[in-house]
Amino acid sequence: PTNHGITTWIGDRAGGAWRGTRRNDSHLPPEYDRNLRASEITLAEVMKKAGYKTFFAGKWHLGSKGSWPTDHGFEINKGGWDVGSPRGGFFSPWQNPNLESGPAGESLTLRLGRETADFIEANKDKPFLAYLSFYTVHGPIQTTPELWKKYQGKATAAGLAKERFLFDRRLSVRQVQDCPIYAGMIESMDDAVGMVLKKLDQLGLADNTIVCFTSDNGGVSSGDAFSTSNLPLRGGKGRQWEGGIREPF
């Protein structure tokens, strides 16, 4: 639902989007959709009509074939399809019909950053919309051995918390960011964002380009490997507390 809201700039329920664990609630009418409706006007469609070259890279998760990025205003699609997590994991070869696998072990996150930077360079002399939607930090939680070693033990050495988990009602919730794998994923995403910003600087486009950075939900602090903590905010992904819905923008 949040991806839908970012793509169309309207409320997800107003647009018919719903994602829940149960479908038998009497308050949820059956017309809620799994695909982004063809009738919805996306940001890409508006920009394309205004003469912008439009590009999408990464996680789409807004419908099956027939409702992919190229069906909703994006002229180029690198990696966007049905699923919300990367099939095959974060290292090549991956199982993605819209992104050719690179050399064995290539980072998906860095590849998406490079694809976006390459698109910007190819279209530096015309207006463009580049929408980079990382699969990171969705599961599976994976990083390189080098990054794992870099962050392993840092939380303990820093004395961030004595109790790693707290029981919140019926949920066991992570209380400290001490997952070295998750930290490695964040660094990879930072590097990929850096590729894009560096390319804008190199081409002299930084002062004439609007860059927006946001997220679709809080980190997973319960279940799914308890990958991170959102303290001092309560809760995380899938919860209506601030840890699940308060995002950077």
Residue ranges of each PLM-predicted region?
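Ser/Thr-centric signal marking residues that sit
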Residues: 1-2, 42, 54, 109, ...
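Long, well-ordered early-domain segments
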Residues: 4-61
